[in-house]
Amino acid sequence: RTGRVTPVLEIEPIELSGALVGRVTAHHAGNVKALRLGKGAIIAVERSGEVIPKIVEVIKPATRTIIVNKCESCGYELTWQRDFLICPNHSECPAQIENTLEHFFKTHGQVDGFGSKSIEKLVTAGIDTLEKIYNSTEEDFQRSGFGPGQSKNLRLELNRSLKVEIEDWRFLSAFGIPQLGQGDSRRLLQNIQFDELSKVTKEEIIAIEGFAEITSADIVAGLKNKWSTIKYMLGLDFKLSKTQLLLESTLINSPISGMKVVFTGKMLQSSR
């Protein structure tokens, strides 16, 4: 969904912790170059937590390393961003569109029926944005290849998602803005109100503890890119639970919070 291309290594199948493993993540393209991973390399692999296979050692590096230069989903030329290869075709790359939509529904957590297969079917039919999905009717879903019953359920789920209370930080993180996961979304909204995010600056975010310069720049760019969609979704009146600002929390917990203060005596200037 962010455009980052994650290389996956095809290895000779080996049994690890009772499972047959034939694919291992290389994490990012920079890792492939640095470790010289390629055909003929010999590596040591383990299942992290007995679930995810990962490389623990390169016993023998490859004599030749091949790095792809085009996105397998849309064919766009890939660009380097630090150690990552990025597909810059954010608005039209099918893989990015599908993963972005799936991320929203998965993060929201209160909308059933919008898994990867359903999202793929919708995108193929041209219903490829949150705006289009939430504006779709049962008939639109049927024209996209869903049956009458499933189409009705999809529409009901969308309606239900508007009425179920959801934390505003979770809602924000669901849009898949780079560098803005759930924890950072909560931290951001503890310092800046949601409706002020459209005009937030890099400097304002840097001033918040935990945000570095590059991260802040990415967040500002991501908010700008996604704001039209965020604004549309806010207009649907989702039932958002507002994050309390740290300043408000400080005032509420102040020793003199709720007390009335009265001054007596004369004032040298103006009246009481």
Where are these regions (language model features)?
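Alpha-helix N-cap recognition
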Residues: 28, 129, 194-196
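Generic recognition of flexible, low-complexity loop/linker segments
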Residues: 31-32, 42, 108-109, 173-175, ...
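N-terminal cationic and glycine-rich segments that engage phosphates or anionic surfaces
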Residues: 1-102, 269
